[in-house]
């Protein structure tokens, strides 16, 4: 989604992930960021959102630590840094890549090579990528290919406040 900096993109996605985990049983979600500390921060935002839900909406929590969450309904959320091995071998319903433009090209290429079987095996697997632009890199190529219909990703541009037009 093409939006200005500091407009709550990552927090909005984390809120969506929490909703998805609570209202869907046995789903696996990965929150991946350019640094492990950033991914843990996003999981912390998810925890804050969870703690502020009405009690009737809160699922029982089986595991909650710095890097993961497991709910009573079988849903799991992993937080880690983006790497070639971050989600290898796993089956994920949603993969969230935060600040993806800050991942070095060789790691981004290795990541997508390793995660492609996971993404393509599930017909309903979602990949959400959010980033501040940073030069002509993997993120840039994916975005522009999506705009031209050269890949299966969607580039979303959202402008809710006309005075904050991007570009």
Name each model feature, range by range.
Residues 1-160, 164:
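Phosphate/NTP-binding elements of NTP-utilizing enzymes
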